Amino acid sequence: MIAGYLCDRQGVDLAAIADHTANWTDENCIEAGTKLKDLSQYFQATAAGDSNDQATAAFYNGEAAMLVQGSWAIAQINGNNPDFESKCGVFQFPGIDGANDPNRMIVKTDNLLMSSTTEHQDAAIALMKMFTDETAQKYTAEVGGKFPIVKDLEIDYDKAPAQLKYVQDIMAKATGTFGFYNESLASVEAGDCFDNAMVDIFLGNQTPEESIPDRTDIL
């Protein structure tokens, strides 16, 4: 997530890379890698290998000052340590002076899908209606701290996690969205290659000038 944000903030254009009007060896890509290495000095030594649960637990247990994470972590954080809610704020990923739009956000969604050939169409539709009705969506917002999908839903912000309003205020300024970089490339192999390149930079195994050009055939 951090590497993807840094690339986007530097103005990396995945569509341009895909049609070969831009390249991973361009200055903005290398600079994103350099900033990733700079930031790596502020993380715990185990950061590259920690699971999502380990990283989140380190935050809500007070072992880490900051967590780079999506709003989906709100319920996990508050559920495991309710006393932590009053200490936990939210801010958007910072911009880079003179670079790309700082109000672009990584946005992911929860999706309910039904097979067109299911033998239980009525039951599947009923389940989707249950998950998307006002009662379920109020629970999603007021307990889970996640964005409801029902337009103009009345949310009791005294009941909802405090972090929900922080995130909504940030998203109100969003000018565009993008996905995780490893999921946005041409293939699963390319996504894995991107992850591996960024991990090598983060750990100091290779410099950005070494790690990225080594993998351009796959990326």
Short names for language-model regions:
Residues M1-A22, A64:
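Extracytoplasmic/periplasmic solute-binding protein
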Residues A18-A48:
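Glycine-centered hinge/linker elements that transmit conformational signals in sensory
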Residues Q41, N80-G145, N196:
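Extracytoplasmic/periplasmic substrate-recognition and gating elements
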Residues T46-N61:
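Short helix-initiation/N-cap motifs at beta->coil->alpha
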Residues N52, Q69-I74, D110:
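Beta->alpha turn/N-cap motifs
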Residues Q54-A57, I74-N80:
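Pocket-flanking alpha-helical
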Residues N61-G70, S86:
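Alpha-to-beta junction loops
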Residues P148-D152, Y166-I218:
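C-terminal capping/gating helix-and-loop segments adjacent to ligand/active sites or protein-protein/ligand interfaces
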